[in-house]
Regions:
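Peri-catalytic and regulatory segments of divalent metal-dependent proteins
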Residues: 11-15
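Short glycine/proline-rich turn/loop motifs
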Residues: 1-5
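Divalent metal-dependent phosphate-bond-processing catalytic cores, especially two-metal-ion Mg2+/Mn2+ enzymes
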Residues: 9-10, 24-39, 47-268
């Protein structure tokens, strides 16, 4: 926990929430338990989820690249933060002797290599720039369920759990939505201070506009993803239903805010 910063959104509470969603998926989905029978695979999943945003600075990759930060230079403008999270993860694990613990086991070196490969692949895939590529392969896996290796399952479970806020209770989902927009605003202020271009949605956004952004994210990213995952893992349908309910609540939320805006405008 000490290696997570006090960012509005990308903090230890986020990592813990993602880990809980992933653990819930593993516990409830029979097909997932079959695909991830090996203890090293399950251990890799839990370590990847809890570490996937470790030491996150509270801004996105675009900020790192635009500001030509040390991390952007180090990782050649490519999945900057995800590469950084991988690096910090293994620095911390090695510092605490996990590699030595592996070395004491039978075939420990091979197990460590497998663990490292699975965790790195999964964390790097949390870069949303890779989402369309992951979605395409997910649709292929629906047609051919044997396509995914155990390592692939770790990658897809982490990415799914990372997109899981709106499958939680409505009040919890709203709290996370509020946090991400606070983080956007914080980044926008830093960009202004550095004289960088600022995305309008990050600086000033009404509640109605925020609702429209979230509704679009649900329609074009979350629903297609979770519905596809539920085709592979039917036990996820309850979370898909919660997601659909959240979408309906956002529709009501938008109508109420638009109505208030109309009344306020008429009053002017």
């Amino acid at each position: 926990r000490e290696h997570y910063l006090e960012s509005y959104f990308h903090n230890f509470e986020h990592a813990f929430t993602v880990t809980l969603v992933a653990f819930s998926m593993l516990s409830s989905c029979r097909g997932l338990r079959r695909a991830m029978q090996e203890p090293i695979v399950r251990f890799s999943l839990l370590m990847a989820t809890v570490c996937h945003d470790i030491n996150h600075p509270g801004n996105n990759n675009e900020f790192e690249v635009k500001s030509q930060s040390r991390l952007a230079i180090l990782y050649n403008d490519t999945s900057v933060l995800e590469n950084y999270h991988c690096t910090v993860t293994f620095e911390v694990l090695i510092e605490h002797g996990l590699d030595e613990l592996f070395a004491e086991q039978d075939a420990g070196e091979a197990l460590w290599e497998e663990f490292r490969q699975i965790v790195v692949q999964a964390i790097l895939a949390t870069d949303m720039q890779k989402h369309k590529q992951l979605q395409k392969r997910l649709l292929e896996a629906i047609r051919d369920p044997g396509l995914f290796s155990p390592a692939d399952w770790v990658t897809y479970v982490l990415h799914t759990a990372d997109l899981g806020n709106l499958t939680l209770d409505w009040e919890v989902a709203l709290e996370w939505e509020n946090r991400i927009f606070k983080e956007f605003k914080s980044q926008a202020r830093r960009e202004q201070e550095l004289g960088l271009d600022v995305a309008p949605y990050m600086l000033k956004m009404s509640l109605a506009a925020r609702g429209r952004v979230q509704a679009g994210f649900i329609d074009f990213v979350l629903c297609p993803w979770w519905e596809s995952m539920a085709q592979l893992l039917p036990e996820l349908q309850d979370r898909v239903d919660t997601l659909h309910l959240s979408r309906k609540k956002y529709a009501i939320y938008l109508k109420e805010n638009d109505r208030r805006a109309s009344v306020d405008g008429a009053g002017d």
